[in-house]
């Protein structure tokens, strides 16, 4: 008799509903099945809040303050790392996510830090249906935008972000350096990188092609999970932002303005139209 406990990969893949051909699962809506409760319960071990805070420093806080932002919509709240940090810094934050399991974990994390999250489960493609009001900034962090597999979905989500911003608002969006992965390179140059900093989990790609980056998350307690994501290229994301209507777009690599082959990109897209600005700025 075979015990399912001896085959955590099979069991957890089944729970995430990847089926017999996981590499063929390339659907935007599937992320809801991927973030099962067991996985979200381990997510903070993947991040390691203290290590990530040290890696980021005050990068996002400084960016928001430089642009005069006070009200922030976090559209990819996850377990609440950025929402809670911003609340602690005095920002007015609304926290949204498409995964109810993630939002539940974020709410508990905030409560444990004497903060109260205002949460909303929302689909980015219909953001204005669920989120009301305008914001100084929208943040979409944690490599979250890669859950959108169709270009139509990506354009619609960006348009929804644009619509909830005030006339001079900004969008801050990050993603992995998928260009390097698609060209045969590694996910991180060395160590754990500066986003997923947990020491008891191994993260790496199992399959990469132009339409899919399938990552494996192996925890020290035997838990193994996967995420299927769309590999966003650097230039493509910038072009898409511009075509949706954002004006000046400034990009960073691993939180630095001057970069070469970083692990992660961060794009800051400004909504405000100014006559004297070169919108081709990199």
From Swiss-Prot:
Keywords, alphabetical: Methyltransferase, S-adenosyl-L-methionine, Transferase
Uppermost EC category: transferase
Entries under InterPro entries matching the protein: Gly/Sar_N_MeTrfase, Methyltransf_25, SAM-dependent_MTases_sf
Binding site for S-adenosyl-L-methionine: 35, 43, 52, 76, 97, 123-124, 141
Biased composition (Polar residues): 1-23
Pathway in which this enzyme or protein is active: Amine and polyamine biosynthesis; betaine biosynthesis via glycine pathway; betaine from glycine: step 1/3; Amine and polyamine biosynthesis; betaine biosynthesis via glycine pathway; betaine from glycine: step 2/3
Chaperone keyword on record: no
GO cellular component: cytosol
Binding annotation for substrate: 143, 176, 217
Catalytic activity: glycine + 2 S-adenosyl-L-methionine = N,N-dimethylglycine + 2 S-adenosyl-L-homocysteine + 2 H(+); glycine + S-adenosyl-L-methionine = sarcosine + S-adenosyl-L-homocysteine + H(+); sarcosine + S-adenosyl-L-methionine = N,N-dimethylglycine + S-adenosyl-L-homocysteine + H(+)
Gene Ontology molecular function terms on file: glycine binding; glycine N-methyltransferase activity; identical protein binding; S-adenosyl-L-methionine binding; sarcosine N-methyltransferase activity
EC number: 2.1.1.156
Xref: CDD domains: AdoMet_MTases
GO biological process, one term: protein homotetramerization
Record note on pH: Optimum pH is around 8.2 and 8.0 for glycine and sarcosine, respectively.
Record region (Disordered): 1-27
Task performed by this protein: Catalyzes the methylation of glycine and sarcosine to sarcosine and dimethylglycine, respectively, with S-adenosylmethionine (AdoMet) acting as the methyl donor. It has strict specificity for glycine and sarcosine as the methyl group acceptors.
Family listed: Belongs to the class I-like SAM-binding methyltransferase superfamily. Glycine N-methyltransferase family.
Subunit (UniProt): Monomer.
Protein name: Glycine/sarcosine N-methyltransferase
Chain's gene name: bsmA
């Amino acid at each position: 008799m075979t015990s399912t406990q001896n085959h955590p990969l099979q069991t957890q893949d089944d729970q995430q509903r990847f089926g017999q051909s996981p590499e063929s699962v390339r659907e935007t809506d599937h992320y809801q099945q991927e973030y099962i409760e067991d996985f979200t319960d381990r997510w903070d071990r993947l991040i390691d809040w203290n290590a990530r805070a040290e890696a980021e420093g005050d990068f996002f806080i400084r960016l928001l303050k430089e642009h005069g932002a006070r009200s922030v919509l976090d559209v990819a709240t996850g377990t609440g790392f950025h929402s809670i940090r911003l609340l602690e810094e005095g920002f007015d934050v609304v926290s949204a996510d498409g995964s109810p399991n993630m939002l539940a974990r974020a709410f508990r994390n905030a409560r444990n830090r004497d903060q109260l999250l205002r949460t909303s489960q929302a689909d980015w493609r219909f953001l204005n249906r669920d989120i009301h009001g305008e914001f100084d900034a929208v943040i979409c962090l944690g490599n979250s935008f890669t859950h959108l597999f169709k270009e139509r979905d990506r354009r619609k989500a960006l348009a929804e972000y644009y619509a909830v911003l005030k006339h001079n608002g900004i969008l801050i969006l990050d993603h992995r350096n998928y260009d390097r992965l698609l060209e045969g390179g590694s996910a991180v140059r060395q160590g754990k990188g500066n986003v997923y900093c947990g020491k008891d989990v191994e993260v790496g790609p199992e399959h990469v092609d132009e339409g899919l980056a399938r990552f494996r998350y192996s925890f020290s307690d035997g838990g193994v999970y996967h995420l299927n994501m769309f590999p966003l290229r650097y230039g493509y994301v910038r072009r898409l932002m511009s075509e949706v209507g954002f004006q000046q777009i400034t990009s960073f690599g691993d939180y630095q303005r001057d970069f070469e082959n970083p692990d992660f990109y961060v794009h800051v897209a400004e909504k405000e139209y100014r006559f004297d600005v070169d919108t081709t700025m990199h």
